[in-house]
Curated annotation (Swiss-Prot):
The keyword Cytoplasm applies. It comes from Rhizobium etli (strain ATCC 51251 / DSM 11541 / JCM 21823 / NBRC 15573 / CFN 42). The gene is ureA. Disulfide bonds: none annotated. Pathway: Nitrogen metabolism; urea degradation; CO(2) and NH(3) from urea (urease route): step 1/1. This is Urease subunit gamma.
Length: 100
């Protein structure tokens, strides 16, 4: 299987998001990369489903709460930017203050 660097990045984020979901199910708090992966995966999958950019920007801020991440992680993440493929092309989606 020959994958482009972008496809490899998407798979890596998706796998990290799967790990993050499993940890949340076990009650384990997420670290920085896991939190970023979970939010990014939400945006990428939402774009694939055809959800509008504005909706993903708003909904992306409700994927993870402060009590689901390790201490100090929420303060470290001010914005998450994801290049996602929508039915009408690739767009940059920015989720501001994603952990509230």
């Amino acid at each position: 299987m020959n994958l482009t660097p972008r496809e490899k990045d998407k798979l890596l984020i998706s796998m990290a998001a799967i790990v993050a979901r499993r940890r949340l199910e076990r009650g384990v708090k997420l670290n920085y990369p896991e939190a970023i992966a979970l939010i990014s995966d939400f945006v990428v999958e939402g774009a694939r489903d055809g959800r509008p950019v504005a909706e993903l920007m708003e909904a992306g801020a409700h994927v993870i709460s402060r009590d689901q991440v390790m201490e100090g992680i929420a303060e470290m993440i001010h914005d998450v930017q994801v290049e996602a493929t929508f039915p009408d092309g690739t767009k940059l989606v920015t989720v501001h203050e994603p952990i509230r």
